[in-house]
Amino acid sequence: MVTIRLQRGGAKKRPFYQVVVADSRNARDGRFIERVGFFNPVASGNAEKLNLDLARIEHWVGTGAAVSDRVAKLIKDAAKAA
């Protein structure tokens, strides 16, 4: 099953997440199909906190991809801000 989920990066105590489309059988930080955005929870100043390609997310959801709970909340926040 294909899912849209977060992939953790960054350093210890400074997380940075890529929003990716991946096969659910792959590891959290493993192989993915497409990168559709990022989420930086520790962004400060004028640094960008959230960037999502809503058109590509819409495409993947239309083809049957499941969305993780956290990514669903991020999509809702991004749509509200746009």
Swiss-Prot record:
Look up the domain of life of the source. Answer: Bacteria
Q: Its GO biological process terms?
A: translation
Q: Does the keyword DNA-binding apply?
A: no
In which family does this protein belong, per the annotation?
Answer: Belongs to the bacterial ribosomal protein bS16 family.
Which Cys residues form disulphide pairs?
none
Q: Which UniProt keywords apply?
A: Ribonucleoprotein, Ribosomal protein
**Per the record, what is one GO cellular component?**
small ribosomal subunit
Protein name per the record: Small ribosomal subunit protein bS16
Q: Which organism is it from?
A: Aeromonas hydrophila subsp. hydrophila (strain ATCC 7966 / DSM 30187 / BCRC 13018 / CCUG 14551 / JCM 1027 / KCTC 2358 / NCIMB 9240 / NCTC 8049)
According to the UniProt entry, its GO molecular function terms are: structural constituent of ribosome
